[in-house]
Amino acid sequence: MFQNNPLLSQLKQQLHDSKPHVEGVVKGTDKAYGFLETEKETFFIAPPAMKKVMHGDKIKAAIETIGDKKQAEPEELIEPMLTRFIAKVRFNKDKKLQVLVDHPNINQPIGAAQAKTVKQELKEGDWVVATLKTHPLRDDRFFYAQIAEFICSAEDEFAPWWVTLARHEQSRYPVQGQEVYSMLDTETRRDLTALHFVTIDSENTQDMDDALYIEPVTAPNDEQTGWKLAVAIADPTAYIALDSQIEKDARKRCFTNYLPGFNIPMLPRELSDELCSLMENETRAALVCRLETDMQGEIVGEPEFILAQVQSKAKLAYNNVSDYLEQVENAWQPENESTQQQINWLHQFALVRINWRKKHGLLFKEKPDYSFVLADNGHVREIKAEYRRIANQIVEESMIIANICCAHYLAKNAQTGIFNTHVGFDKKFLPNAHNFLMANLSNEENQQELAERYSVENLATLAGYCRMRHDIEPIEGDYLEFRLRRFLTFAEFKSELAPHFGLGLTGYATWTSPIRKYSDMVNHRLIKACLANRECVKPSDETLARLQEARKQNRMVERDIADWLYCRYLADKVESNPEFRAEVQDCMRGGLRVQLLENGASVFVPASSIHPNKDEIQVNTDELALYINGERRYKIGDIVNIRLTEVKEETRSLIGNLV
């Protein structure tokens, strides 16, 4: 009687339409139920309804009121959490193939089929790439996936690398090379092989793309008036045609990927590590910048760019050069007087330039780099905190001044290029930055002066931003630096000259690593076009966008692999509840995120372990500080002692408690 009754259908539709509808994102839990988070509130999703959705799905749901509680009934899929994803192979009790999504908040197994292109015989725990084919809300069928790619076996010790690269859709292989390479540049090169160029790199570096030669500038009375520096940079574009496959692959990769233990080069290894590498006593094609400074490190006159042949006379290592300059006992010594002279002069020049940048630009605060020392099987033997020593600073200062010269040379002669830019504070956060500085630095005496000094208008200028950074530099601790960092915008690649607030410079364009960075290859081609009086083609928006995207991807790959390796390294140490000094990186409602100073690992400290009553914990998002009963206990930049209590390799997370 009631079947196909139009009145009943109409009544049902009216009842449905009368219910409020919301859009939101599904939040899974480790129980069968979940939640729908909307902009304004959070709704309960009952276990039967959770079977139709997955953590992270963006959905439309009807809101039903049951008793005095509201709950969401999922109705429509707006955007699935999963499309392409990383998973582990699983076989259920009936030996049916399933996949377990590699995500900390998704724990339901998904039925799967193997694509015909995947030839491997899959075993429990193998790593794969899968795509979601059906979704209950969209297709009226259960979740179902197709395995599209085999990554590695469950036993592969290098899974952290291969899985992470697959997740971010990056190749684990170098770019394919050519059978032969020939010199494509027809211009005459100046012979600079007599100059005593030296390279300073890590001991094991093969892709050496910069060599340095320096001499003092003297007046007729033999008094020194400045420095003359030649920066020779490897010239891969001399061998790579613009329409070649190597160029296309480099444009896609954008950077050499430096991973714990090894790198994946942007160019074929026979170019990056051999033909273009500025190897000791080998004549190499190079693009050279010759520049002069006065005794204070100020650039004098116009820098000169030339195509040249150079020959590195010494392959030097950072630690050896630093030991020698710091007069460490039994330190390495230069092989001959010419090399010794170059090291000493480069040292003097670097100190002058550091001083110049301190006054006229901005210096980065010293923070260590953490490097993983691996055994052949990929196991982490140790993690070293490496500080930049004087030899690193020599190379850094030489590269920075060369990149400043490149920016202004391209702006003047090519009217375009790939420029590294940074505009400081995000416009929308300028008032926040002003208020924060006033709250932390002003008092009754200086309030009027600082209100002007740190006005929104002044903070938006390069000079005003640099002045503010110089003001806070002597202040003890990292709190101001860390908090202000959250108000900054991201660095960007642009095709016109623009300031780089982070460096405190009016212009910056890198060209000193063409073996490792595609942007530097582009700038090489533009410098060469200027030298040959050819047309300079503006880099496309697509190239700039790809550089931005690739830089972000590479950082995520490096971070994800490191998180995994930290878990492996600390897994067998957690039983002894080791204690570490750590720096607070973030304060959240759920707890603190801290970084271990000894090895750089990121550890989460749950709020429940800090204070038993969560209602008495408040987080001040303006200060990025955690309060207990109205009293500020922790803020970003604080140094705390923590005890490591848990290592979860499956989610790549470390848990600790405050001591």
Swiss-Prot record:
SMART domains: CSP, RNB, S1. It is found in: Cytoplasm. Its EC number is 3.1.13.1. It catalyses: Exonucleolytic cleavage in the 3'- to 5'-direction to yield nucleoside 5'-phosphates. Residues 189-532 form the RNB domain. Keywords: Cytoplasm, Exonuclease, Hydrolase, Nuclease, RNA-binding. The keyword Hydrolase applies. Residues 577-659 form the S1 motif domain. One of its GO terms (cellular component) is cytosol. The keyword tRNA processing does not apply. It comes from the Bacteria. Pfam families: OB_RNB, RNB, S1. One of its GO terms (biological process) is mRNA catabolic process. InterPro entries: CSD, NA-bd_OB-fold, RNase_B_OB_dom, RNase_II, RNase_II/R, RNase_II/R_CS, RNase_II/RNase_R, RNR_Ribonuclease. GO terms for molecular function: exoribonuclease II activity; RNA binding. Involved in mRNA degradation. Hydrolyzes single-stranded polyribonucleotides processively in the 3' to 5' direction. Belongs to the RNR ribonuclease family. RNase II subfamily. This is Exoribonuclease 2.
